[in-house]
C-alpha cells in the first residue's frame, strides 16, 4: 500500500501539538492551584501508613498504572484500582488513610462517577485530573489539576494522544514534588532498583563479584610456555605469580607476553624475567564496583588482583566484567 502523505511532517506535527500542550499546562502552576495541597495531602497519608490509589479506565487506566510504577520506584506507596473491579470486591484494597487520584480526561466516565460516592462515604479525599473543574467528576472531588488541551495530536482529533501525554506529565509533577519533599536521593532510588545500573554503582561491592576459584596462579620459576598454557586455560588474559605462601609476586599480562615475544625470549625462560613484578593490588573488598573500575582505569590495567593485609591473593576481578555490567568511571 503506497503512503500518500509525509510521515516526517506528521511526526513533527504530533510532537509539536503534544509539546505545545505541555507548555500550555505550565500556566496552571503560575496561577492559584491545588498542587501544594495535594502534595501535603499525600505526605500526610504516607505518615499514617496510607497510599495513593490511582483510578482510571481505558487509556487512562494504562497511564494510571505507569504513574503507580513511577511512584513505587521513588518510595511512594501506590496502587492501581480499576473502577469496574472496585465495584465487585477490589474496593477492599482501599484502606483507611489512603488518598484517591481519579483520572478521566472528560470527567464524565460513568465507571468513575459510580465509584466516587462509595469512596466519599468512606471519607477518602479525592484528587481529580480532568479537562475541566466543572466536569461531573471534578465537582465531586476535593482537589483538582487540569488536563485541558486544545486538541488531540491524532489526525482526526479523537484518539487519546495529547491528553495522555499531559496526564503522564502531571503524574511526573506529583512524583517530583514528593521526591523533593522527602529529599529522595540517588541512594534511595538505587535501593528500589538493585538490578539497575545505579544500583550496581551504589550497592554492589568488589567482594560480591570477586572470582576466588580457578585462578591462573603460577610460581615465578614457571616457564614462559607453561605460563601461556595457564593463561589460556583460565581465560583471564593474565597469570598471577605467587610464592609458596600464596603471596603476590607479580602479574603476567597479555602486554607482557607480547613484549617478551618481540624480544625473542625462549619458551623455557622463567616467567619472572618478563612479568610485571610488584604489581598494583587491591585490598578493600568492601569497595564499590565503581571504585574498582576507577582503580583499574587509573593504573591502566585490566585485572584487579585482590590481596589481604599479608599480601596473599584472595581473588580477581576483570575489567571486562565491570564493562559488561554497563559501568563507566
Swiss-Prot record:
Superkingdom of origin: Bacteria
Disulfide cross-links: none
GO biological process: carbohydrate derivative metabolic process; carbohydrate metabolic process
UniProt-annotated binding residues for ATP: 56-61
Organism the protein comes from: Helicobacter pylori (strain J99 / ATCC 700824) (Campylobacter pylori J99)
SUPFAM superfamilies membership: SIS domain
Transmembrane stretches, start-end: none
Protein name: Uncharacterized protein jhp_1324
Amino acid at each position: 500500500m503506497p503512503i500518500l502523505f509525509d510521515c516526517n511532517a506528521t511526526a513533527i506535527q504530533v510532537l509539536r501539538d503534544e509539546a505545545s500542550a505541555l507548555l500550555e499546562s505550565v500556566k496552571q502552576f503560575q496561577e492559584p492551584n491545588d498542587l501544594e495541597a495535594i502534595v501535603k495531602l499525600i505526605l500526610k497519608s504516607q505518615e499514617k501508613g496510607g497510599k495513593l490509589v490511582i483510578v482510571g479506565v481505558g487509556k487512562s487506566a494504562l497511564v494510571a498504572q505507569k504513574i503507580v510504577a513511577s511512584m513505587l520506584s521513588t518510595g511512594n506507596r501506590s496502587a492501581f484500582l480499576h473502577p469496574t473491579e472496585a465495584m465487585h470486591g477490589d474496593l477492599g484494597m482501599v484502606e483507611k488513610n489512603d488518598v484517591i487520584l481519579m483520572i478521566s480526561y472528560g470527567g464524565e466516565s460513568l465507571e468513575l462517577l459510580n465509584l466516587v460516592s462509595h469512596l466519599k462515604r468512606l471519607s477518602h479525599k479525592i484528587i481529580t485530573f480532568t479537562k475541566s473543574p466543572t466536569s461531573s467528576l471534578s465537582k465531586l472531588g476535593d482537589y483538582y489539576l487540569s488536563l485541558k488541551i486544545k486538541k488531540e495530536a491524532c489526525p482526526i482529533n479523537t484518539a487519546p494522544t495529547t491528553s495522555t501525554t499531559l496526564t503522564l506529565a502531571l503524574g511526573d509533577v506529583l512524583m517530583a514534588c514528593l521526591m523533593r519533599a522527602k529529599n529522595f536521593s540517588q541512594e534511595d532510588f538505587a535501593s528500589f532498583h538493585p538490578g539497575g545500573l545505579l544500583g550496581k554503582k551504589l550497592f554492589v561491592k568488589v567482594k560480591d563479584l570477586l572470582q576466588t576459584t580457578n585462578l591462573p596462579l603460577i610460581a615465578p620459576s614457571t616457564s614462559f610456555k607453561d605460563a601461556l598454557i595457564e593463561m589460556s586455560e583460565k581465560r583471564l588474559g593474565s597469570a598471577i605469580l605467587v610464592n609458596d605462601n600464596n603471596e603476590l609476586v607479580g602479574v603476567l599480562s597479555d602486554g607482557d607476553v607480547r613484549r617478551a615475544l618481540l624480544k625473542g625470549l625462549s619458551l623455557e625462560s622463567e616467567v619472572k624475567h618478563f612479568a610485571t613484578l610488584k604489581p598494583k593490588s587491591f585490598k578493600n573488598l568492601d569497595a564499590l564496583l565503581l571504585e574498582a573500575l576507577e582503580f583499574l582505569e587509573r593504573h591502566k590495567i585490566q585485572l584487579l588482583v585482590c590481596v589481604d593485609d599479608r599480601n596473599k591473593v584472595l581473588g580477581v576481578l576483570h575489567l571486562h566484567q565491570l564493562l559488561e555490567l554497563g559501568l563507566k568511571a
